[in-house]
Amino acid sequence: MATIANPRDIILAPVVSEKSYGLMEQNVYTFFVARDANKTQIKIAVEEIFGVKVASVNTVNREGKRKRSRSGFGVRKATKRAYVTLREGSDSIDIFNGSVA
């Protein structure tokens, strides 16, 4: 397990999609994370950056899409997403209205 000193190297960006907006009402937040980060590192990073208590972390590895261009085929880079559920009674994360990052 590689130790990453800075938690901002683990949490890369919030995911902006209809699904992620809908999940925020249920206290579930979605982030792009480093491909080599594990669930424990993600939990610690979210708690340090946003000052909240995390109940669970679910991760999804997404393979890069194959895309065609004029010169042939290419592949978008693969990503890893983390669905972070906060504990009951924990403060919500104001991702899109504040300058936390």
From Swiss-Prot:
Keywords: Ribonucleoprotein, Ribosomal protein, RNA-binding, rRNA-binding. One of its GO terms (cellular component) is ribosome. One of its GO terms (molecular function) is structural constituent of ribosome. Signal peptide: none annotated. One of the early assembly proteins it binds 23S rRNA. One of the proteins that surrounds the polypeptide exit tunnel on the outside of the ribosome. Forms the main docking site for trigger factor binding to the ribosome. Belongs to the universal ribosomal protein uL23 family. One of its GO terms (biological process) is translation. HAMAP family: Ribosomal_uL23_B. The keyword Ribosomal protein applies. Part of the 50S ribosomal subunit. Contacts protein L29, and trigger factor when it is bound to the ribosome. It comes from Corynebacterium efficiens (strain DSM 44549 / YS-314 / AJ 12310 / JCM 11189 / NBRC 100395). The gene is rplW. InterPro entries: Nucleotide-bd_a/b_plait_sf, Ribosomal_uL23-like, Ribosomal_uL23/eL15/eS24_sf. This is Large ribosomal subunit protein uL23.
